[in-house]
């Protein structure tokens, strides 16, 4: 006779239409336990080439992706419908300029190039998938320089964390964090400084204060009879250096309480906005001309330079019967002096009263005085 437990059986049905009297129930003698193993997660390893050939012509090539299954033995509710994705990426992708052009010319002294060892060409790091997509989709929003300077700074910071010193030849760059006063309080500002330019600030300040302004000798003032202290006007080399000195810009009457935070600069500005705009000149030249390889700090300077290669001349002389066109507004202003007769550049030698419309013509003329003395 069967026990009570063998006779007692329960059947649970939902929305069943068949009466229980027509269902024959059979007891189960043994329940077989089956262990379930399935691949519930995957690891995606993205190996990004961090060498100089990881991009070409400004286009990013998709990295190699290797899939490796991971076996999971513990399943919770709903785990079989989910996948865990881990993206391993090397660094953020930024705009790229032809690396061959980065070594051309002498105007690349301020650029920063990261040396990469052979072991660093394929090296994985770990990042979340959502963070990777945010870096890719929000790149332009995060960069105040249109994705160029900010992206390059990100790469250099990554190299600095790994012990790599960003340098180009003898250039050694160091990042400096400064605090700038804003409307909402102080905020940090990252600035790159060339270690080779570090000198004694006191000596630089004294030298800056003692340097006279010789530009007045190019616009009408005559040389004194005793000459200029420290300059031999009879020496062609010293005279050529004298003519190549840049004139100092006249300072306005408004106060300039904000000083440039870059070591050794010392320039003063009327507000923080003007100072922050000036700070860009101390950074790397990331805007490179694809035609000749010249590099510029600001994209606007690069666009103006590219007019030389394209042959475009948007500036036209408005004087009747002339109509000459120029690629730069500066050249147009200089050309207009031919029509107006304006000759602001006067020979500084006492016995000479020649005047010129362009400073370059005056500089060439000044050297003739030394040549004539040597011929006598």
From Swiss-Prot:
Q: Where is this region: Disordered?
A: 201-220
Keyword terms, alphabetized: Activator, DNA-binding, Metal-binding, Nucleus, Repeat, Repressor, Transcription, Transcription regulation, Zinc, Zinc-finger
Its family remark reads: Belongs to the YY transcription factor family.
Membrane spanning stretches: none
The places in or outside the cell where this protein is found are: Nucleus
Query: What superkingdom heads the lineage?
Result: Eukaryota
Biological role stated in the UniProt entry: Functions as a multifunctional transcription factor that may exhibit positive and negative control on a large number of genes. May antagonize YY1 and function in development and differentiation.
UniProt keyword Phosphoprotein present? no
Q: What is this protein called?
A: Transcription factor YY2
Gene Ontology molecular functions? DNA-binding transcription factor activity, RNA polymerase II-specific; RNA polymerase II cis-regulatory region sequence-specific DNA binding; zinc ion binding
GO cellular component entries: chromatin; PcG protein complex; transcription regulator complex
ZnF C2H2-type residues are: 258-282, 287-309, 315-339, 345-369
Q: Region Mediates transcriptional repression: what ranges?
A: 241-376
Residue ranges for the region (Mediates transcriptional activation) are 36-109
Q: What else is known?
A: The gene encoding this protein appears to have arisen by retrotransposition of the YY1 gene in placental mammals. It is encoded by a single exon found in an intron of the gene Mbtps2.
Q: Which Gene3D superfamilies match?
A: Classic Zinc Finger
Organism in which the protein naturally occurs: Rattus rattus (Black rat)
Where would you say this protein principally sits, based on its record? nucleus
């Amino acid at each position: 006779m069967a026990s009570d437990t063998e006779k007692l059986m329960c059947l649970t049905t939902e929305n069943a239409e068949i009466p229980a009297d027509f269902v024959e129930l059979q007891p189960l003698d043994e329940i077989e336990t089956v262990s379930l193993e399935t691949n519930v997660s995957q690891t995606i390893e993205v190996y990004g080439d961090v060498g100089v050939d990881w991009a070409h012509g400004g286009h990013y090539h998709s990295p190699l992706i290797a899939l490796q299954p991971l076996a999971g033995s513990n399943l919770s509710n709903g785990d079989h419908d989910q996948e865990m994705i881990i993206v391993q990426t090397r660094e953020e992708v930024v705009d790229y300029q032809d690396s061959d052009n980065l070594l051309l010319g002498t105007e690349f002294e301020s650029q920063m190039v990261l040396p990469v060892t052979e072991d660093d060409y394929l090296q994985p790091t770990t990042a979340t998938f959502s963070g990777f997509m945010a870096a890719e989709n929000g790149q332009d929003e995060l960069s105040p320089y249109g994705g160029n300077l900010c992206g390059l700074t990100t790469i250099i910071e990554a190299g600095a964390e790994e012990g790599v010193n960003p340098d180009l030849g003898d250039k050694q760059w160091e990042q400096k964090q400064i605090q700038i006063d804003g409307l909402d309080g102080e905020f940090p500002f990252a600035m790159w400084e060339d270690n080779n330019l570090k000198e004694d600030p006191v000596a630089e300040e004294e030298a800056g204060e003692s340097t006279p302004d010789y530009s007045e000798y190019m616009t009408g003032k005559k040389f004194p009879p005793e000459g200029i202290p420290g300059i031999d006007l009879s020496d062609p080399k010293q005279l050529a250096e004298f003519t190549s000195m840049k004139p100092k810009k006249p300072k306005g009457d408004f106060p300039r309480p904000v000083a440039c935070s870059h070591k050794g600069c010392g320039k003063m500005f009327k507000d923080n906005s003007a100072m922050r705009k000036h700070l860009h000149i101390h950074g790397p030249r990331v805007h490179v001309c694809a035609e000749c390889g010249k590099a510029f700090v600001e994209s606007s300077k690069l666009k103006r330079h590219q007019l030389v290669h394209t042959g475009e001349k948007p500036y036209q002389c408005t004087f009747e019967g002339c109509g000459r066109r120029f690629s730069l507004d500066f050249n147009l202003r200089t050309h207009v002096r031919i029509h107006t007769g304006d000759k602001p550049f006067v020979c500084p030698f006492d016995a000479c009263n020649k005047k010129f419309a362009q400073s370059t013509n005056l500089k060439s003329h000044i050297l003739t005085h030394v040549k004539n003395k040597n011929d006598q």
